């Protein structure tokens, strides 16, 4: 495993399975991935969500996201296991450009000075927009009044 590549696998489980079965599936796929040479970076259950379209007569599904690293050989085993499982209704694995981004801090990614900068930019943009709108109104009213004067001369 000299050449490590980052992957993300998202799979959808049937909505009617019990919560302990969901945990068993997550553990099973995590264990299978590690046994086949992959390294788990992050595993998250995203919860039950409505599907965009019906899949295998289901309108909802339980989403699970799995971020992992490996040489690529481990993907075949995990996808084969998902394909053979009746509880997995859809799965997709994509190659990532690099490692996972670091999670944002609890202040939602903005400090107070950045927030003030954004607010000042917003107020500047609003005032410039109002000035442009006023200029257009003035130009339109001037051209309308000059056209009216020309028609009176004729």
Curated annotation (Swiss-Prot):
Q: Which Pfam families match?
A: Ribosomal_S6 (PF01250)
Its recorded name reads Small ribosomal subunit protein bS6
**What keywords sit in the KW lines?**
Ribonucleoprotein, Ribosomal protein, RNA-binding, rRNA-binding
What does the record give under GO molecular function? small ribosomal subunit rRNA binding; structural constituent of ribosome
Name the Gene Ontology biological process terms: translation
Q: Which PROSITE patterns match?
A: RIBOSOMAL_S6 (PS01048)
Could you tell me where the Basic and acidic residues compositional bias lies?
A: 113-139
User: Which Gene Ontology CC terms are recorded?
Assistant: cytoplasm; ribonucleoprotein complex; ribosome
Report the function annotation for this chain: Binds together with bS18 to 16S ribosomal RNA.
Residues annotated as signal peptide = none
């Amino acid at each position: 495993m000299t050449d490590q590549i980052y992957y993300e696998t998202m799979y959808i489980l049937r909505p009617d399975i019990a919560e302990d079965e969901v945990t068993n599936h997550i553990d099973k796929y995590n264990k299978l991935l590690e046994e086949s040479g992959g390294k788990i970076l992050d595993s998250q259950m995203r919860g039950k969500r409505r599907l965009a379209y019906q899949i295998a007569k289901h309108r909802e599904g339980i989403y699970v996201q799995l971020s992992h690293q490996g040489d690529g050989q481990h993907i075949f085993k995990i996808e084969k296991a998902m394909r053979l499982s009746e509880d997995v209704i859809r799965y997709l694995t994509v190659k990532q450009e690099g490692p996972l981004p670091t999670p944002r801090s609890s202040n939602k990614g903005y400090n107070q000075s950045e927030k003030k900068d954004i607010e000042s930019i917003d107020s500047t943009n609003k005032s410039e927009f109002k000035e442009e709108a006023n200029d257009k109104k003035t130009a339109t009213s001037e051209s309308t009044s000059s056209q009216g004067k020309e028609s009176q001369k004729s």
